[in-house]
Amino acid sequence: MSAGPVRIARTEDLAAVRRLGVACGLEDSGRSDEQIEAAWGAFAGERLVGAIALERNEGLETVNWMAVDGDYRRRGIAGRLYAALEREALVRSITRLWVTARAPAFFLSQGYTAVPEGDERDILMGECPRCAQLGRGCEPQALTKRIDDSGPPDGSRSEGETWHDRD
């Protein structure tokens, strides 16, 4: 069972990120780790209990490998991991993020919107239409979000706080 604080930190252990993702039900696309630009882990002590990666996929800056161990869910870890990724994207002057969301509600709550039919959607959906998991607990959605540091539409936030830090 989960106990104690969980810290968010950059990680270079991409194999552990993949193992956690697969253990949480994500499909390993087999893409090269060279496409991963940065990754973060959520650590309970030394144990990796959550992860997320910023990946470049055919010219799209994508969120990938977002997973949280079942014993650690509903504690705001996904939001903290995503916030770290979005802050890094801003530092890198990335203006748009993309995701193939297996859990679209989380990303929709972060301001993502559906990607219309076209090349970007085709890239994001990739092998999904042929995947054995499709329709068996997996209903992925191609989503995108324009990012900047302006905060939520009503402009409310504390000094130095990005709007998604308040989960």
Describe the predicted segments one by one.
Residues A101-P129, Q133:
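Conserved active-site alpha-helix within GNAT-family acetyltransferase domains
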Residues R74-R87, V99:
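Conserved acetyl-CoA-binding loop-helix of GNAT-fold acetyltransferases
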Residues M1-G30, G41-F43, E139-A142, R146-D167:
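Short amphipathic alpha-helix that is part of the acyltransferase structural core
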Residues A89-R102:
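Conserved GNAT acetyl-CoA-binding A-motif
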Residues D13, G59, R102-A103:
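A generic "binding-loop/recognition-motif" signal
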Residues R47, D69-R80, R92, S109:
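Conserved glycine-rich acetyl-CoA-binding loop
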Residues G41, R47-E55, L60-A67:
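Conserved beta-strand in the GNAT
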Residues T62, L134-G135:
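Membrane-topology and secretion signals of cell-surface/extracellular proteins
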